[in-house]
């Protein structure tokens, strides 16, 4: 039964809904792991003192990886 200001799903009323809840939990865990990995990579890249001068001025690479997904 749904309650006011409830943060989760209501109780499942069918086996299909039970499976959807399990799928949601599984997908949410995968999204959480990917987000954690991306956050770790961002923090590692920002906090490192090592820089490559060729990466800082690579506008061509940025143009390619911005336009390529739009073309695909």
UniProtKB/Swiss-Prot annotation:
Bound cofactor: record note: Binds a dinuclear copper A center per subunit.
Transmembrane annotation, as ranges: 15-45
Location within or outside the cell: Mitochondrion inner membrane
Main location, first listed in the record: mitochondrion
Protein EC: 7.1.1.9
Cofactor(s) in the UniProt record: Cu cation
Keyword set, alphabetical order: Copper, Electron transport, Membrane, Mitochondrion, Mitochondrion inner membrane, Respiratory chain, Translocase, Transmembrane, Transmembrane helix, Transport
EC class (word): translocase
Membrane topology: Multi-pass membrane protein
Any one GO molecular function term: cytochrome-c oxidase activity
Residue ranges, Mitochondrial matrix side: 46-72
Catalytic reactions of this protein: 4 Fe(II)-[cytochrome c] + O2 + 8 H(+)(in) = 4 Fe(III)-[cytochrome c] + 2 H2O + 4 H(+)(out)
Biological process per Gene Ontology, one example term: electron transport chain
Topology, Mitochondrial intermembrane side: 1-14
Record InterPro entries: CcO_II (IPR045187), Cyt_c_oxidase_su2_TM_dom (IPR011759), Cyt_c_oxidase_su2_TM_sf (IPR036257)
Single GO cellular component term: mitochondrial inner membrane
Subunit structure: Component of the cytochrome c oxidase (complex IV, CIV), a multisubunit enzyme composed of 14 subunits. The complex is composed of a catalytic core of 3 subunits MT-CO1, MT-CO2 and MT-CO3, encoded in the mitochondrial DNA, and 11 supernumerary subunits COX4I, COX5A, COX5B, COX6A, COX6B, COX6C, COX7A, COX7B, COX7C, COX8 and NDUFA4, which are encoded in the nuclear genome.
Functional summary from the UniProt entry: Component of the cytochrome c oxidase, the last enzyme in the mitochondrial electron transport chain which drives oxidative phosphorylation. The respiratory chain contains 3 multisubunit complexes succinate dehydrogenase (complex II, CII), ubiquinol-cytochrome c oxidoreductase (cytochrome b-c1 complex, complex III, CIII) and cytochrome c oxidase (complex IV, CIV), that cooperate to transfer electrons derived from NADH and succinate to molecular oxygen, creating an electrochemical gradient over the inner membrane that drives transmembrane transport and the ATP synthase.
UniProt record similarity statement: Belongs to the cytochrome c oxidase subunit 2 family.
Name by which UniProt lists this protein: Cytochrome c oxidase subunit 2
Organism, scientific name: Lepisosteus oculatus (Spotted gar)
């Amino acid at each position: 039964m749904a309650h006011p200001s409830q943060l989760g799903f209501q109780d499942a009323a069918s086996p299909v809904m039970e499976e959807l809840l399990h799928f949601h939990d599984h997908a949410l865990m995968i999204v959480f792991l990917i987000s954690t990995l991306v956050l770790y990579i961002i923090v590692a890249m920002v906090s490192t003192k090592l820089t490559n001068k060729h990466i800082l001025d690579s506008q061509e690479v940025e143009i390619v990886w911005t336009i390529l997904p739009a073309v695909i």
